Structures are given as structure tokens and as C-alpha cells.
């Protein structure tokens, strides 16, 4: 049974495919379906965007589709960049520019006021239009400089005090066990397992 990931982000596809392996689905990217137009992420919340993307992918492919919207919420910036995390520094989306803008905005902010969290909402859309959602978050602190080579996005700036490493320094297995996406996906996998059993009957 196919599960379409409603993203062309290679880093995200790799991460999600690895996490979803145990579910028994054949995981494919929306990029394998020519003609699909990327959905504009214009929702006010992560849930709005995830649902919109999942529904569009399920409708286009006729398959079960999964989409996530996630981002960084920095307390000193009143929750920004939030839903604008991927395009914080404008279009085209650029991790380097986004990280530079974040560091610039937090210049002079003391370490104990640089608290932040990654939040993720996963939406699963059935071809009939039924929607299921799951959410996860991970608390951390924004560093003053990039650390680590792994991950993507804000990972090199997001420091997890409990592990004394940034998301970019953690190995994939450890990151997946504590990350916002990992936590949301754990809940989503329970939904997927129920749907899989239902389909097999």
C-alpha cells in the first residue's frame, strides 16, 4: 500500500521515509507524480498548511497522503518565525539566509532568553477526503553560532540542553527519537497502523 509524502524537500523525505519504515507502507514522494503543483502554504497555523498539502496530494494521486508543516517558535520573537520558518528571509527558501536573519534578530539577546521550540503537525489524508492529524514539539535554545553538519534548516542553531548538542550534531536515530517530527510521527504511525489494518481486512 502506497503512502505519498506531500513534499519535495529531500531532507524531509529521507527523514520521514526512515521513520515510516516499520509501518509497512511503500513510501513515495509527491515528486514521483509528474504534474503535481506545489501547494501554497498560506495557512495561519501549521495544521492549516499540513491539512491543505495532504488533501491536495491525496486528491491528485488517489493514494493515502501524508504532509507535515513544522517550524521554529522563538519566545524572544513572540513565536516567530512560526509558519514562515521556511521562507523567513524571503523567497526562494534558503536555510543559510534564514539562519543569518534569525541570528541577526537575536543579536544582544541573553542566552536565557533565547528559548525556542520546534513544532510539527502531521496531516494524513485519505483519498476520500478524511483527515487525521498528530502534533509534536521539542524544546531548546538558539545558539549564537552554527554547530554541526547534519540535519537541515535551523538544526545547527537549535541546541537541546538535555543532550548538550544541536539537532545538527545529534545522530539521526537520537534526533528522530526526541524531535518534534519524531514525536508527531510516532502518533501518526498509530493512525497509519489503524488505517493499514483497516485496508487489509
Curated annotation (Swiss-Prot):
Organism in which the protein naturally occurs: Desulforamulus reducens (strain ATCC BAA-1160 / DSM 100696 / MI-1) (Desulfotomaculum reducens)
Keyword set includes RNA-binding: no
Q: What does this protein need as cofactor?
A: Mg(2+)
Keyword Magnesium attributed: yes
Superkingdom of origin = Bacteria
Catalytic activity from the UniProt record? XTP + H2O = XMP + diphosphate + H(+); dITP + H2O = dIMP + diphosphate + H(+); ITP + H2O = IMP + diphosphate + H(+)
Q: What is the lineage of its organism?
A: Bacteria, Bacillati, Bacillota, Clostridia, Eubacteriales
Q: Where does substrate bind?
A: 7-12, 70, 152-155, 175, 180-181
State the InterPro entries in the record: dITP/XTP_pyrophosphatase, ITPase-like_fam, RdgB/HAM1
Q: What class of enzyme is it?
A: hydrolase
Q: What name does UniProt use for this protein? A: dITP/XTP pyrophosphatase
Pfam families xrefs: Ham1p_like
The active site of this protein is located at: 69
What does this protein do, in the record's words?
A: Pyrophosphatase that catalyzes the hydrolysis of nucleoside triphosphates to their monophosphate derivatives, with a high preference for the non-canonical purine nucleotides XTP (xanthosine triphosphate), dITP (deoxyinosine triphosphate) and ITP. Seems to function as a house-cleaning enzyme that removes non-canonical purine nucleotides from the nucleotide pool, thus preventing their incorporation into DNA/RNA and avoiding chromosomal lesions.
Amino acid at each position: 500500500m502506497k503512502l505519498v509524502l506531500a513534499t519535495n524537500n529531500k531532507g524531509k523525505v529521507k527523514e520521514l521515509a526512515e521513520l515510516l519504515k516499520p509501518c509497512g507502507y511503500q513510501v513515495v514522494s509527491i515528486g514521483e507524480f509528474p504534474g503535481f503543483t506545489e501547494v501554497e502554504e498560506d495557512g495561519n497555523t501549521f495544521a492549516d498548511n499540513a491539512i491543505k498539502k495532504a488533501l491536495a496530494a491525496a486528491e491528485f494521486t488517489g493514494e493515502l497522503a501524508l504532509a507535515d508543516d513544522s517550524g521554529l517558535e522563538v519566545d524572544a520573537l513572540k513565536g516567530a518565525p512560526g509558519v514562515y520558518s521556511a521562507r523567513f528571509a524571503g523567497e526562494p527558501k534558503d536555510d543559510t539566509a534564514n539562519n543569518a536573519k534569525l541570528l541577526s534578530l537575536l543579536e544582544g539577546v541573553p542566552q536565557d532568553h533565547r528559548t525556542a521550540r520546534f513544532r510539527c503537525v502531521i496531516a494524513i489524508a485519505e483519498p476520500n477526503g478524511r483527515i487525521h492529524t498528530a502534533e509534536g514539539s521539542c524544546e531548546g535554545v538558539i545558539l549564537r553560532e552554527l554547530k554541526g553538519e547534519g540535519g537541515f534548516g535551523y538544526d545547527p542553531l537549535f541546541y537541546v540542553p538535555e543532550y548538550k548538542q544541536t539537532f545538527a550534531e545529534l545522530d539521526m536515530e537520537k534526533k528522530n527519537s526526541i524531535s518534534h517530527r519524531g514525536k508527531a510521527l510516532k502518533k501518526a504511525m498509530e493512525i497509519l497502523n489503524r488505517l493499514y489494518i483497516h485496508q487489509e481486512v
